[in-house]
Structure formats: structure tokens, C-alpha cells
């Protein structure tokens, strides 16, 4: 096989509709658009959401909710995710670089989900009571 001999599979490609090529084609003269009217004209169609002058649905329904500019960006980290990290000292930057938490997270908290058997030292990261106990049982510490 060579790059210049590759072809699409049989029947996978269909030819485009050829319009305006005579009566016998079934798509001659008016090209399948019918006679007169807005939809037969070039560029003749309403914009998306237009309902003929009736108040459109997106304007009939009320606005709802808002985006809080002060929302807390605290990420949740599982014990099982901590166990997979290649380093022992864990801080916010390490978690971001490993892709465990989002890049815009301002803080993180470790929760008791999964198990951990290796020593981990948390720096500047909060932990729930259960997660703290599991980390300390594995020989690690939570220095906040």
C-alpha cells in the first residue's frame, strides 16, 4: 500500500446534489426550491430564532441565575489520587502540575476516598479528619 493508492471504502462517499442541470434530473430550473417566496430567493431566510414577528421563545422566558464572581475555588483530592503521585511532599503546585486539580483552584482539601500506604507530607493543603488519620497512619503528616 502506498499513500497515492489509498481510496475511501466503496459506498462511503456520495456525490453532491447537482442542481440546475435540466428537467430530466428532477432538480432543473428552480433547483428544488419551488416557485417564488422568501425561501426561493438567494439569501432569503430568517435568522435563527425568528418566529415571524411573534416574541421569540428565548425572549419570552425570563433570565435566571447568575455567575458568582466570589465563588470558592476549592478542589477536592482523594487519598487514592495522592497515592499515585510520584513525590512525597505535596502542595498546591504539585497537584496542579500532576493534573489532579484544576489550574484555577485556589485551595485544595483531601478527603477520605480510597486508601493510601505510602508516606505523604501535605503542605498548605487541608484534610478531613478521616483523611488526616489515614495519612498519619501511613507515616505521613499534614503540616498546614
UniProtKB/Swiss-Prot annotation:
This is Large ribosomal subunit protein uL15. GO terms for cellular component: cytosolic large ribosomal subunit. GO terms for biological process: translation. Residues 21-31 have a biased composition (Gly residues). It comes from Azoarcus sp. (strain BH72). PROSITE patterns: RIBOSOMAL_L15. GO terms for molecular function: rRNA binding; structural constituent of ribosome. Transmembrane segments: none annotated. Belongs to the universal ribosomal protein uL15 family. Binds to the 23S rRNA. Part of the 50S ribosomal subunit. NCBIfam families: rplO_bact (TIGR01071). Keywords: Ribonucleoprotein, Ribosomal protein, RNA-binding, rRNA-binding. It comes from the Bacteria. Residues 1-51 are annotated as: Disordered. Pfam families: Ribosomal_L27A. PANTHER family: 50S RIBOSOMAL PROTEIN L15 (PTHR12934), LARGE RIBOSOMAL SUBUNIT PROTEIN UL15M (PTHR12934:SF11).
Amino acid at each position: 500500500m502506498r499513500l497515492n493508492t489509498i481510496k475511501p471504502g466503496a459506498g462511503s462517499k456520495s456525490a453532491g446534489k447537482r442542481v440546475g442541470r435540466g428537467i430530466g434530473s428532477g432538480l432543473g430550473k428552480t433547483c428544488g426550491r419551488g416557485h417564488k417566496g422568501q425561501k426561493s430567493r438567494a439569501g432569503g431566510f430568517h435568522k435563527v430564532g425568528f418566529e415571524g414577528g411573534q416574541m421569540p421563545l428565548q425572549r419570552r422566558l425570563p433570565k435566571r441565575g447568575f455567575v458568582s464572581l466570589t465563588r470558592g475555588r476549592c478542589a477536592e483530592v482523594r487519598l487514592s489520587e495522592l497515592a499515585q503521585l510520584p513525590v512525597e511532599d505535596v502542595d498546591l503546585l504539585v497537584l496542579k502540575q500532576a493534573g489532579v486539580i484544576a489550574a484555577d483552584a485556589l485551595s485544595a482539601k483531601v478527603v477520605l476516598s480510597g486508601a493510601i500506604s505510602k508516606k505523604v507530607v501535605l503542605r498548605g493543603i487541608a484534610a478531613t479528619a478521616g483523611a488526616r488519620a489515614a495519612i498519619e497512619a501511613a507515616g505521613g503528616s499534614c503540616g498546614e
